[in-house]
A protein has these predicted regions:
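Extended hydrophobic leader/signal-anchor segments used for secretion and membrane insertion
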Residues: 1-219
Length: 219
């Protein structure tokens, strides 16, 4: 009677993998959390809201150099889907006209962007008389200008094409803003969004040397 012999397991049998080291597990968890945070951030700035920086004072006194304004991105998507349209008084930002000088980075990102105020839309006529903007012959109140007028600016009657917007900077001084007076009406589908709230800097020094809260809606 033979004696049973114990033979080693066949080499084809798969051995249990060694458990990952604590350091490797920690690294994997860290990378996963960063990836999830990046995806959430991209979704927020694409569909919820982002900010746009103000360079120069062409929109003074409403927006000042160095400030940042909140842009509700859901409004942009609503406009692209035909659920809303940009209207007179909206402060919008868009890609600068094609003749604007661009750096290599701006060519890659689609910039530079400019921010102006809508004063008329497609089918409307814009005039300047006695320093006042008239749309279809009706003077516009423009309370956000604090009494400033286009006294030194002449503008012949302009009929805004359908699907376009006539935009102006709030700084109406000579050479204060390069806007539709220089490059004409802009296509409405180039609008990237509406500036709704000034969110940076949160506080600002006033002319008397004191500090005041700078968070405010864009007029």
């Amino acid at each position: 009677m033979g004696v049973p012999q114990h033979r080693p397991a066949a080499s084809s049998e798969v051995e249990s993998a060694a458990p990952a080291s604590p350091r490797r597990r920690a690294r994997g968890g860290w990378l996963r959390r960063w990836a999830e945070a990046l995806v959430v951030a991209l979704l927020v700035v694409t569909f919820v809201g982002t900010t746009v920086g103000i360079e120069g004072n062409s929109m003074a006194p409403s927006l000042l150099d160095g400030e940042r304004a909140l842009v509700p991105r859901y409004e942009t998507w609503a406009a692209r889907l035909g659920l809303r349209s940009w209207s007179s008084g909206d402060v919008v930002y868009f890609r600068a006209p094609g003749d604007t000088p661009r750096t290599l980075l701006e060519r890659f990102t689609g910039g530079p962007f400019v921010i102006k105020r809508v004063v008329a839309s497609g089918g409307q006529t814009v005039d300047v008389r006695a320093g006042r903007i008239l749309v279809d012959g009706v003077p516009q109140p423009e309370a956000y200008l604090n009494g400033l007028r286009l006294a030194n600016v002449r503008l012949t009657s302009v009929l805004v094409p359908e699907g376009h917007l006539f935009v102006l900077g709030d700084d109406r001084s000579p050479l204060g803003s390069r806007d539709s007076r220089a490059f004409g009406p802009v296509p409405a589908d180039t609008i990237q969004g509406r500036a709704a709230w000034v969110v940076w800097p949160p506080v600002r020094r006033d002319a008397d040397g004191g500090w005041h809260v700078n968070l405010r809606p864009v007029p």
